């Protein structure tokens, strides 16, 4: 980081959500509830997958990593937003802002790659069921997840290093509730053409290419399903990928609306609302989508509750006996 960058600005001001002061308490309670639901729901998914041996399959291996990523992704922005709403302290230090940008990009890209890996898993399961065990081996799954982490880290690091080279002069007010990369580039008084090129390249790598892979996977899945002779087989195939398809639809609809619509149709308030859906709502909904539409998850939850009930009953008997 150059001395010019260090002396130009030491902190930024986050304006937060476009809400009136009298609405702060309501929105604070709402987002706190959403964040707790996100954390607890995804932790429950991870716990169920860990405890139930029937869920030790490639699909749930990817799902457990997606749950961890959703917790982390939401934790990058929501706690800071809640703290700002509660204390009205809107300042964030320069290094803290750069760090938040890094982790936001990292977990956003990781989410995209993991969802793509899950689509590939569903493609193999439905289109090549006889070879599923030999293709989706444990080492293959680990490689897909590890590759997702490495590529996401590289993309985030590229953006962060380029961002750290920019100078920020007089204006240090960010009209957002977190340190959004696009908002930071607008504040810079340096040439951001290299940053814009990096954003375009990363969008192809981390958004469009995974989305294309998902479309191709589901295209093959659709063709295979149409060739299944029995209605029961079709329903089973659809139930296998229904939850994942719902997550893909919510995730990429928000991404496309936020980053790929023409600027003229996107006001700042609309961008903030889309970001809220992207960072707070979607990670909260994922556990419900996978649990409500998944017999394996619901079965594992019933087992966990029955075990908990049995343990509680045994503890009560011991207490009474003592």
Swiss-Prot record:
UniProt keyword 4Fe-4S, yes or no: no
PROSITE patterns for this protein: G_PROTEIN_RECEP_F1_1, G_PROTEIN_RECEP_F1_2
Cytoplasmic topological intervals: 50-57, 121-139, 220-236, 293-322
Gene3D superfamilies noted in UniProt: Rhodopsin 7-helix transmembrane proteins (1.20.1070.10)
Gene Ontology annotations for the cellular component aspect, listed alphabetically: plasma membrane
GO MF term (any one): G protein-coupled receptor activity
Transmembrane segments: 26-49, 58-79, 101-120, 140-158, 197-219, 237-259, 273-292
S-S bonds: 97-189
Extracellular-side segments: 1-25, 80-100, 159-196, 260-272
Superkingdom to which the source organism belongs: Eukaryota
Pfam families: 7tm_4
Coiled-coil parts of chain: none
Function: Odorant receptor.
Name used for this protein in its record: Olfactory receptor 1J1
Recorded name of the encoding gene: OR1J1
């Amino acid at each position: 980081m150059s001395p010019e960058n260090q002396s130009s600005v030491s902190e930024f001001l986050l304006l937060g959500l476009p809400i009136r002061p009298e609405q702060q308490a309501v929105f604070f309670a709402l987002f706190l509830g959403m964040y707790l639901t996100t954390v607890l729901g995804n932790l429950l998914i991870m716990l169920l997958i860990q405890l139930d041996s029937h869920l030790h399959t490639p699909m749930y291996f990817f799902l457990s990593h997606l749950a961890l990523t959703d917790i982390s992704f939401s934790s990058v922005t929501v706690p800071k937003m809640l703290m700002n709403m509660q204390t009205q302290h809107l300042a964030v230090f320069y290094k803290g802002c750069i760090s938040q940008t890094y982790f936001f990009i990292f977990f956003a890209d990781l989410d995209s790659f993991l969802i793509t890996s899950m689509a590939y898993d569903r493609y193999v399961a439905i289109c090549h069921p006889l070879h599923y065990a030999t293709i989706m081996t444990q080492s293959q799954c680990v490689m897909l997840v590890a590759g997702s982490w490495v590529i996401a880290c590289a993309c985030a690091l590229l953006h962060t290093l380029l961002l750290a080279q920019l100078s920020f002069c007089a204006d240090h007010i960010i009209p957002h509730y977190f340190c959004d990369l696009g908002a930071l580039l607008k504040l810079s008084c340096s040439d951001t053409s290299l940053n814009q090129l990096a954003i375009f390249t990363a969008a192809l790598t981390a958004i469009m290419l995974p989305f294309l892979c998902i479309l191709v996977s589901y295209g093959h899945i659709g063709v295979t399903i149409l060739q299944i002779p029995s209605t029961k087989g079709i329903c089973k195939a659809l139930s296998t990928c229904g939850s994942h398809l719902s997550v893909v639809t919510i995730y990429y609809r928000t991404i496309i609306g936020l980053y790929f619509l023409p600027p003229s149709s996107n006001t700042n308030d609309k961008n903030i609302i889309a970001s809220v859906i992207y960072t707070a709502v979607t990670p909260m909904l994922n556990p419900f989508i996978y649990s409500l539409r998944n017999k394996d998850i619901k079965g594992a939850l019933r087992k966990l509750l029955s075990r908990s009930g049995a343990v509680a009953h045994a503890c009560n008997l011991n207490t009474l006996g003592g």
